[in-house]
């Protein structure tokens, strides 16, 4: 008779296993270098093949959605940094955009362009971390070092804008806190000229490497049907033959004015996902280059003129008494959107990042729900890992590019 699950009984003790001397139960993680966070997998093996896989999550659960109900909308922005802490601008933006749509705030054009620039730099940073750790899992130490070297340039640029390298809090409700510093664009364009050459170096080292292809081709195949039924998005969905990118299908910011391609593949294996991440970084460079023309042609406003919801600029706060009072009220009492609900989805580096807010007209959301791509991509392990060799588990997990801060929230 199985033991009834309760909050004190560990997850794996509630799983029924048939006694079979030909099978073995293996705990993968939660302290495993290839788990990319506190992920635990209970694997049932028949020889070297996985016949059953059960992901156990929750080690990094912080109750972020409940925290939002006890914080003002402005106070919650730094918390969004900790969802996907590898691409925090994507989280900042998705939350702020949802609040702006709820409050019907029109964000100035220059602020929208700066958001696109930071989002694409964040995408490159996230993809480089994927490439570095994925290569290291399979034994390619050189690519790990090269990718981290280039990632430093990206983090340095973001740091020069907002002062933080990882948890940026770079977006504000109603716009952006700062314009781009003098000389910043020139540095970014210099990076955009150099980075495609670096990508080619990665591809020369990996794409036709015999060992790399043997480890990734026809491994961890996700069919189109499985990807759709499991709620996959981003590269995980596009690698399985579904050409879907929210930036193209439901454009936001100024993405509808930018020319870029949506790479996709049909193989659905680890190698296809690797190829798409490489191609996406090239598209990010194309987007960043086009943003210069849009930025130069835009007016200097970076904060919306909505006194009920948006604080004045720092210069106005320090020089105008009315602006100081307005800022004091907004910060101490918080903004109060009208009653209603909103769901906004954006294309984060890992897939569809959605924010649902239910407002009852108070300074804190009545309910906030974060739809993270990594949660769906982790849930697919129960189907994806069955039939795979134990030696391929690290490669498959790496190719799904999950982050446990997103999974557990």
From Swiss-Prot:
GO terms for cellular component: plasma membrane. Its main location: membrane. InterPro entries: NADH_Q_OxRdtase_suD, NDH1_su_D/H, NiFe-Hase_large. It is an enzyme of class 7 (translocase). GO terms for molecular function: NAD binding; NADH:ubiquinone reductase (non-electrogenic) activity; quinone binding. It is a peripheral membrane protein. Belongs to the complex I 49 kDa subunit family. NDH-1 is composed of 14 different subunits. Subunits NuoB, C, D, E, F, and G constitute the peripheral sector of the complex. This is NADH-quinone oxidoreductase subunit D. It comes from Campylobacter curvus (strain 525.92). The lineage of its organism: Bacteria, Pseudomonadati, Campylobacterota, Epsilonproteobacteria, Campylobacterales.
């Amino acid at each position: 008779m199985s033991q009834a699950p309760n909050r004190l009984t560990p997850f794996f003790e509630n799983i029924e296993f048939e006694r079979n001397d030909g099978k073995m139960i293996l705990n993968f993680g939660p302290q495993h270098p290839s788990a990319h966070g506190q992920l635990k997998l209970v694997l049932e093996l028949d020889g070297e093949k996985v016949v059953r896989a059960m992901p156990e999550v929750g080690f990094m659960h912080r109750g972020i959605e409940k925290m939002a109900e006890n914080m003002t909308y402005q106070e919650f922005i730094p918390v969004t940094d900790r969802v996907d802490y590898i691409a925090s601008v994507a989280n900042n933006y998705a939350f702020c955009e949802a609040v702006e749509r709820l409050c019907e705030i029109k964000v100035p054009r220059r602020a929208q362009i700066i958001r696109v620039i930071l989002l694409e730099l964040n995408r490159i940073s996230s993809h480089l971390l994927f490439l570095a750790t994925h290569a290291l899992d399979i034994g390619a130490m050189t690519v790990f070092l090269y990718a981290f070297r280039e990632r430093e340039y990206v983090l340095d640029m973001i740091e020069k804008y907002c002062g933080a390298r990882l948890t940026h809090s770079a977006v504000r409700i109603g716009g952006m806190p700062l314009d781009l510093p003098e000389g910043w664009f020139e540095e970014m364009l210099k990076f955009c000229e150099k980075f495609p050459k670096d990508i080619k170096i990665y591809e020369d080292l990996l794409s036709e490497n015999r060992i790399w292809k043997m480890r990734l081709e026809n491994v961890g195949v996700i069919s189109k049907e499985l990807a759709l039924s499991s709620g996959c998005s981003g590269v995980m969905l596009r690698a399985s033959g579904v050409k879907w990118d929210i930036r193209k299908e439901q454009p936001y910011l100024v993405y509808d004015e930018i020319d870029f391609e949506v790479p996709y593949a049909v193989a659905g294996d680890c190698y296809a996902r690797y190829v798409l991440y490489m191609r996406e970084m090239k598209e990010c460079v194309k987007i960043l280059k086009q943003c210069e023309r849009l930025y130069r042609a835009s007016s200097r406003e970076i904060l919306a003129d909505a006194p009920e919801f948006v604080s004045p600029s720092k210069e106005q706060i320090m020089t105008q008494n009315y602006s100081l009072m307005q800022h004091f009220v907004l910060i101490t009492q918080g903004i109060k959107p009208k009653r209603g609900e909103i769901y906004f989805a954006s294309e984060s580096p890992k897939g569809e990042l959605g924010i649902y807010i239910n407002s009852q007209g108070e300074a804190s959301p009545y309910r906030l729900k974060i739809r993270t791509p990594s949660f769906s991509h982790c849930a697919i392990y129960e189907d994806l890992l069955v039939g795979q060799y134990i030696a391929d588990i690290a490669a498959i997990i790496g190719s799904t590019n999950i982050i446990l801060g997103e999974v557990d929230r």
